[in-house]
Design a protein with these regions (language model features):
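Conserved helicase core region in the C-terminal RecA-like lobe
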Residues: 1-8, 65-68, 180-186, 295
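C-terminal, active-site-flanking charged/polar segments
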Residues: 11-31, 213-230, 245
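C-terminal, charged and often intrinsically disordered regions of DNA end-processing helicases
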Residues: 16-111, 161-163, 282-283, 291, ...
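Short acidic (Asp/Glu) and glycine-rich catalytic loops that position anionic groups and cofactors
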Residues: 57-59, 78-86, 103-104, 122-130, ...
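A non-catalytic, helix-rich entry segment at domain boundaries
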Residues: 98-168, 172, 251, 258
Length: 298
């Protein structure tokens, strides 16, 4: 079919017949294609309760998937069990893409740290700007931010050395397998420093007063992996706040490890039982969730 508007103010182009071998009839055939244009498709929301048996203890958990499970069991079920993927038909960058680029720039820069001139970082920014036209302004802003980081970190590394970048790991804790990628590992004398880069302007770090409500165990996963890899307990964990060029120590590490132990024990207790994958109570979690349409939480 050839579709066109035929009304008092619009009609088919006079060049249309020159483009096709057959003569185009201008009488309407609305009935032939109205199901394409005019049908109202009803969205089926997943409102029913989901209860099923799943061996949660057999899953290899990342800090991200575990956080999703703690925040919203329904999202975890859709994303990690049914593996329903978010659509990618968009030219505009996803929220996480800028952070991924900054991570990649820092990884590439420190791979060849012998050349510690800021011009190398500028070259890397130019490379990623050419690949991501929608992020040109954001990357230009971040290039200026990373200059402060470059000066601070250059001085800091006079007294320590980087021993690993983007370190993959898989290990076991309390009978449950965990995996992930550590952004960076430094060594200062006999102390290992595990570092997680953060680009968020709203970085919030758990304290000894509020850690019991946390759902973020990323540095704890890293600490456990480091203990396994380097067979040492001389490990400190830090967030590297790139927005403000400051290292923030995970002061609640020991308490959060105790809490993680408790939560993993709970996982094992309910594994292979009827588990309810309910929607989260805190609807603020739904604001940027890829599954909010399915859950009827738009």
């Amino acid at each position: 079919f050839i579709s066109y508007v035929n009304s008092d103010t619009n009609q088919i182009s006079r060049f249309a017949n020159e483009l096709f071998n057959t003569h185009i009839k201008t009488d309407t055939n609305d009935n032939s294609y109205k199901h394409i244009l005019y049908d109202n498709h009803k969205i089926n929301h997943l409102d029913k309760e989901i209860i099923t048996k799943i061996d949660l203890a057999a899953i290899v958990w990342s800090a991200t998937s575990f956080r999703t499970y703690l925040q919203c069991k329904r999202k975890f079920y859709l994303q990690n069990i049914l593996k329903i993927k978010e659509h990618t038909l968009s030219l505009k960058p996803k929220a996480y893409e800028l952070g991924d680029i900054i991570h990649s720039i820092l990884e590439d820069y420190y791979k060849d740290f012998a050349n510690d001139d800021f011009s190398k970082i500028e070259e890397l920014f130019n490379k990623y700007k050419s690949l991501n036209p929608f992020l040109i302004l954001d990357l230009e802003i971040w290039k200026k931010k990373l200059y402060d980081f470059y000066l601070y970190d250059k001085d800091r590394l006079k007294h320590r050395k980087i021993i690993a970048l983007e370190k993959n790991f898989e290990c076991e804790f309390e009978g449950i397998k965990i995996r992930g990628v550590i952004d960076r590992i430094d060594k200062y004398e006999d102390m290992y420093e595990v570092i997680d880069y953060k680009t968020s302007s709203t970085l919030s770090v758990d304290t000894l007063k509020n850690y019991e409500k946390t759902d973020d165990f990323q540095l704890e996963f890293y600490y456990l992996a480091m203990s396994e890899i380097y067979k040492s307990d001389k490990i400190e964990a830090y967030y590297y706040d790139l927005n403000n060029t400051v290292l923030i120590k995970e002061i609640a590490l020991d308490k959060k490890l105790e809490l993680l132990t408790q939560k993993f024990k709970e996982l094992k207790e309910i594994s292979n039982t009827e588990i309810s994958f309910s929607k989260c109570e805190d609807k603020s979690n739904c604001t940027y969730c890829a599954y909010k349409t399915i859950c009827n939480r738009e």
